[in-house]
């Protein structure tokens, strides 16, 4: 079963080479009970670690069950430890956050079985601890903890059990109980190898090997070796590998348990991710809301709309800054419509602030004088009532179409149609309510009143000019030509000097404005999201720091897991899963906080915010990616720890 030849083990202590084992050769048959004794420094524990595949010899040959150990990879050694070897340690090495049955089942998570309550219960009953199945290690005596360790060593039906000073920390009663359990296991055909310094225990073995100064001093057969057993130990089947998905689910479950055991540290680790994700979701919601508001506001304008405004140029004077400032008149508007081909319709506009009163209610809002064509050009067909006509415009009729905000502030739930209001102390009859447009950032598009443009000019504002002219072009392809014709016609009508013709009138293409605003909004959204993403990266660095600390604190646990059969990838996935759990939990909480922040901003400030599914998925995915990226190094560091070095770590 075990055949070692010329085994040597040396350690380099600075410039000094220390030989611990000096050419040991021995064979151990199946079903034997071997005690290895020797004083401190004799090499007995080192020999057991090599036999148990926790350490590798510097020189020599080790054949285990017909396989040369030196030819096995690290993962193959882990599989042999898991399937064929059980360990009982002097320090018990139970995980304090787990119940007894979970500690017993721990090796199963690295096989296809996973945690098994029934198997653990049967083994705990076998070692006399069935009533302690839900107790944690700090609730048990030393003897009880060692019996749990024995049950753990049996969970995978091992061929060999290695016990390193199994009674070293126990009272005499517990010592006898543990030795009796080991004898019963040996009677069942399991090979037992015990390292001890107690002569009484050594004398109870079937074979006693004494070491001194790294060599075998004596090898004595105390009891005859029984015939080779024909038990289930000889009928082992290769266990199939676990499905990757199931394996990852178990690692994630372990990750949740670990984090639950360190709530404060886990919470602080999540905080950076939480803030970062909340900021990303909130900023993207603000940006998306602003963009959609702009799109909604401009979509009604159409891509064939031009807006003409007068510049700051003065004409007719003999000195700079003298003369009359250029204004756009109603005659200009009529001429534009009649003389420039390609124009479908025009709507002059004159606007200003107005104090509105209705009974005992007051409201200050924007008052716009527009032409009847405005209704079609700006998608402003009233949802209640009607728009004013061209006849009412020419007759300067005192009628008004109000926005939904004005209607709500002045009339509440009452219908405003037919009611009389005062605009700057002038009586107007409400004939319609405009469709709801929503907010464009801090500006409320529904907080306005439309009146006939001629009425506004002469009855409200006392002007003989308009502020701007909306011009709808029939075909988008004609827009450049119409723009040039507008500039030429207006410069000619107002006798603008050649040197000032570029500044006298401004013609805005709403399609270009819409594109520019959308581009600006997208850029702003990305800028805000990028700034927020920085906090995510900072949170990721925090996770990496915490995980590195965790690896250091749990070095002995890592050694234990490797001793009971965890491969390098198992340790890697476990710590990676823990960092993913931290980042994903932080991400989910951050998404909730970000959504709440967006709703709060929308309610308190009245800004439009939109939390899109894309932003939520992006934030969630990015938080998981942060966990993977920043958890990789600590996980890799943990996976590369050598089993025996990790177990010895203090």
From Swiss-Prot:
CDD domains: ABC_MJ0796_LolCDE_FtsE
EC number of this enzyme: 7.6.2.-
Main localisation: membrane
Localisation: Cell inner membrane
Enzyme class: translocase
InterPro entries: AAA+_ATPase, ABC3_permease_C, ABC_transporter-like_ATP-bd, ABC_transporter-like_CS, MacB-like_ATP-bd, MacB_PCD, Macrolide_Exporter_MacB, P-loop_NTPase
One annotated GO biological process: response to antibiotic
Keywords recorded for this protein, A-Z: Antibiotic resistance, ATP-binding, Cell inner membrane, Cell membrane, Membrane, Nucleotide-binding, Translocase, Transmembrane, Transmembrane helix, Transport
Any single Gene Ontology cellular-component annotation: plasma membrane
Positions that bind ATP: 38-45
Residue spans crossing the bilayer: 267-287, 531-551, 580-600, 610-630
Ranges where the ABC transporter domain occurs: 2-238
Subunit-structure text: Homodimer.
Role according to the record: Non-canonical ABC transporter that contains transmembrane domains (TMD), which form a pore in the inner membrane, and an ATP-binding domain (NBD), which is responsible for energy generation. Confers resistance against macrolides.
Protein known as: Macrolide export ATP-binding/permease protein MacB
């Amino acid at each position: 079963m075990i055949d070692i030849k010329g085994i040597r083990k040396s350690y380099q202590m600075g410039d000094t080479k220390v030989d611990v084992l000096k050419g040991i050769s021995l064979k151990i048959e199946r079903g034997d009970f071997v005690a290895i004794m020797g004083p401190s420094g004799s090499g007995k524990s080192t020999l057991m670690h090599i036999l148990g595949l926790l350490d590798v010899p510097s020189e020599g040959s080790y054949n285990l069950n017909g396989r040369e150990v030196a030819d096995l990879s690290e993962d193959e050694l882990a599989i042999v430890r898991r399937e064929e070897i059980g360990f009982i340690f002097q320090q018990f090495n139970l995980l304090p956050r787990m119940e007894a049955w979970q500690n017993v089942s721990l090796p199963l998570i690295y096989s296809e079985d996973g945690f098994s309550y029934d198997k653990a219960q049967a083994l705990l009953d076998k070692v006399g601890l069935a009533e302690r199945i839900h107790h944690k290690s700090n609730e048990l005596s030393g003897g009880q903890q060692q019996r749990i360790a024995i049950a753990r060593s049996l969970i995978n039906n091992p061929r060999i059990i290695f016990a390193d000073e199994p009674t070293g920390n126990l009272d005499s009663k517990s010592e006898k109980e543990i030795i009796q359990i080991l004898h019963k296991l040996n009677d069942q055909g399991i090979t037992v190898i015990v390292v001890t310094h107690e002569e009484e225990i050594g004398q109870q073995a079937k074979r006693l090997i004494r070491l001194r100064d790294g060599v075998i001093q004596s090898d004595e057969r105390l009891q005859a070796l029984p015939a080779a057993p024909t038990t289930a130990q000889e009928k082992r089947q290769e266990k199939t590998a676990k499905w990757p998905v199931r394996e990852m689910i178990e690692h994630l479950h372990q990750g949740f348990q670990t984090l639950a055991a360190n709530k404060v540290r886990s919470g602080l680790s999540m905080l950076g991710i939480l803030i970062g994700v909340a900021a990303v979701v909130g900023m993207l919601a603000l940006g998306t809301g602003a963009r959609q508001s702009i799109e909604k506001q401009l979509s009604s304008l159409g891509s064939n709309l031009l807006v003409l405004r007068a510049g700051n140029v003065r004409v007719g004077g003999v000195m700079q800054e003298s003369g009359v400032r250029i204004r756009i008149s109603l005659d200009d508007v009529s001429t534009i419509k009649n003389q420039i081909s390609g124009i479908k319709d025009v709507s002059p506009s004159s606007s200003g602030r107005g104090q509105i009163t209705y009974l005992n209610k007051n409201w200050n809002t924007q008052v716009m004088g527009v032409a009847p064509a405005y209704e079609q050009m700006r998608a402003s067909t009233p949802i209640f009532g009607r728009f004013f006509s061209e006849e009412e415009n020419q007759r300067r009729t005192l009628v008004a179409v109000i926005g939904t905000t004005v209607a709500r502030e002045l009339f509440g739930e009452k219908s405003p149609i037919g009611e009389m209001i005062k605009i700057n102390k002038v009586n107007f009859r409400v004939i319609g309510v405009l469709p709801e447009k929503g907010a464009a950032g801090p500006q409320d598009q529904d907080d306005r009143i439309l009146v006939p443009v001629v009425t506004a000019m002469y009855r409200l504002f006392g002007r003989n000019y308009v502020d701007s002219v909306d011009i709808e072009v029939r075909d988008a392809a004609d827009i450049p030509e119409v723009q040039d014709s507008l500039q030429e016609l207006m410069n000619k009508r107002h006798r603008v000097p050649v040197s000032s013709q570029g500044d006298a009138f401004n013609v805005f293409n709403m399609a270009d404005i819409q594109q520019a605003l959308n581009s600006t909004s997208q850029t702003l959204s990305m800028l805000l999201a990028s700034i927020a993403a920085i906090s995510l990266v900072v949170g990721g660095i925090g996770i990496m720091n915490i995980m590195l600390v965790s690896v250091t604190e749990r070095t002995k646990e890592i050694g234990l897991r490797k001793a009971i059969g965890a491969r390098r990838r198992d340790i890697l996935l476990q710590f990676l899963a823990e960092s993913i759990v931290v980042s994903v939990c932080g991400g989910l909480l951050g998404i909730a906080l970000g959504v709440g922040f967006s709703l709060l901003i929308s309610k308190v400030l009245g800004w439009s915010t939109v939390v899109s599914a894309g932003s939520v998925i992006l934030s969630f995915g990015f938080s998981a990616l942060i966990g993977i990226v920043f958890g990789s190094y600590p996980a890799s560091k943990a996976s590369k720890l050598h089993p025996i070095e990790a177990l010895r770590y203090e």
